From Swiss-Prot:
SS bond list: none
Name the record gives this protein: Molybdenum cofactor guanylyltransferase
Gene: mobA
Listed EC numbers: 2.7.7.77
Binding site for GTP: L15, A16, G17, K28, D74, D104
Named cofactor requirement(s): Mg(2+)
Reactions mediated catalytically: Mo-molybdopterin + GTP + H(+) = Mo-molybdopterin guanine dinucleotide + diphosphate
Residues engaged in binding Mg(2+): D104
């Protein structure tokens, strides 16, 4: 990848609006890792990268508010899934692109975030998703905000998979190494515990 690729201006969306089933119903972004809520780790990584930091959350808004420029919520009740949060983020975004991250990837680093933006700039009209171990990571992506109508059309047609929506829009892949530790989803108590010996 060339170092002179322009980086698209990005709003950043942190997804923290899920039901937290794998965490026993806990609000996942507020679960602690290394003594701090997961959302704090993500905020520390991304805050210097944008002046438009959005958090998608459906509860505990007062606890998330200090870590975002704006909060968004799903437009339907009963936790309809991450595509609802992405749609809300696209509607709120002030920049041309929306970089999306789940709240349970505290080991992501600045180099990968830079690479995501740089790769998105190579074909700025297409969504970009991370890919590793022969599968996509649809919640680690960069989406042109101009594609909001396509996301809305897919939602209204009954689609609920962000990955399918983006693949249907000819998503680009940013390929990461197999078993890349930066992509570890710490979405169960067991995974949080197993990664507690490794700092972010």
């Amino acid at each position: 990848m060339t170092s002179n690729t322009p980086l698209p201006p990005c709003s950043i969306l942190l997804l923290a609006g899920g039901r937290g089933q794998r965490m026993g119903g806990q609000d996942k972004g507020l679960v602690e890792w290394h003594g701090e809520p997961l959302i704090v780790h993500l905020h520390r990584k991304v805050r210097p990268l944008t002046d438009d930091l959005i958090i998608s959350c459906n509860r505990n808004r007062e606890r998330y508010a200090p870590f975002a420029d704006r909060l968004v919520s799903d437009d339907e009740e009963d936790f309809p899934g991450p595509l609802a949060g992405i749609r809300a983020g696209l509607k709120a975004a002030r920049h041309t692109h929306l970089l999306v991250l789940p709240c349970d990837v505290p080991r992501i680093d600045l180099a990968l975030l830079h690479n995501m933006r740089e790769a998105a700039g190579l074909n700025s009209e297409k969504p970009l998703m991370l890919r590793h171990d022969d599968h996509w990571e649809p919640l680690l992506c960069v989406i042109p905000v101009a594609l909001l109508p396509a996301f809305e059309n897919a939602w209204n047609a009954g689609e609920r998979s962000p990955g399918r929506v983006m693949r249907n829009l000819d998503a680009q892949a940013l390929v990461c190494p197999d078993n890349d530790p930066r992509l570890a989803n710490l979405n169960t108590p067991e995974l949080l515990s197993s990664h507690n010996t490794v700092s972010d």
